[in-house]
């Protein structure tokens, strides 16, 4: 969450999901880059600890608040505790979770999965085939505008419909 391009891109997924009327979902995967660490890695772990306490909505509110408060480029958040309490999380439970390292494996698995798909920078977006059944996906690197992502989605939807018609 230290990536300045991710910060710029952050509102784009919400715009797409909101405009989709329930047809699009967005899944977050962590990929703290080495030159943004240790702040980016700590924020990834922190987001998971918030999700444990506050659920999916709490996770997204926290991520939004981190993007709002971070100095960026590895500078971190000056007062992480205030961001934590600002989303209504219990600070002691959060500190215990963060100190336990219980989400280290999850964050590392996200990093390794991204690398296995050829992702080497952030943000990165995978558009997965229409209704997730085509098996097709396309990687879009960088802070793409909503229109570019929507164009790929439309193309995949049309291809899926053509494939369905051909198979009938």
Q: Which ranges hold each PLM region?
A:
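Structural alpha/beta surface segment adjacent to cysteine/selenocysteine redox centers
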Residues: 1-85
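C-terminal cap of thioredoxin/glutaredoxin-like
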Residues: 11-17, 81-168
């Amino acid at each position: 969450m230290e990536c300045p391009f991710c910060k710029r891109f952050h509102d784009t997924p919400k715009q797409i999901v909101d405009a989709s009327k329930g047809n699009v979902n967005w899944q977050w995967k962590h990929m703290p880059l080495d030159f943004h660490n240790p702040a980016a890695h700590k924020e990834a772990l922190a987001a998971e600890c918030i999700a444990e306490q506050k659920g999916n909505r709490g996770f997204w509110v926290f991520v939004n608040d981190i993007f709002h408060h971070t100095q960026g480029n590895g500078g971190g958040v000056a007062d992480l505790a205030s961001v934590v309490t600002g989303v209504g999380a219990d600070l002691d439970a959060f500190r215990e979770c963060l100190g336990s390292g219980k989400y280290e494996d999850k964050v590392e698995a996200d990093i390794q999965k991204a690398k296995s798909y050829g992702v080497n920078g952030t943000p990165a977006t995978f558009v997965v085939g229409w209704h997730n059944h085509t098996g097709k996906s396309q990687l879009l690197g960088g802070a793409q505008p909503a229109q570019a992502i929507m164009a790929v989605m439309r193309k995949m939807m049309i291809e899926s419909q053509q494939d369905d018609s051909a198979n009938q």
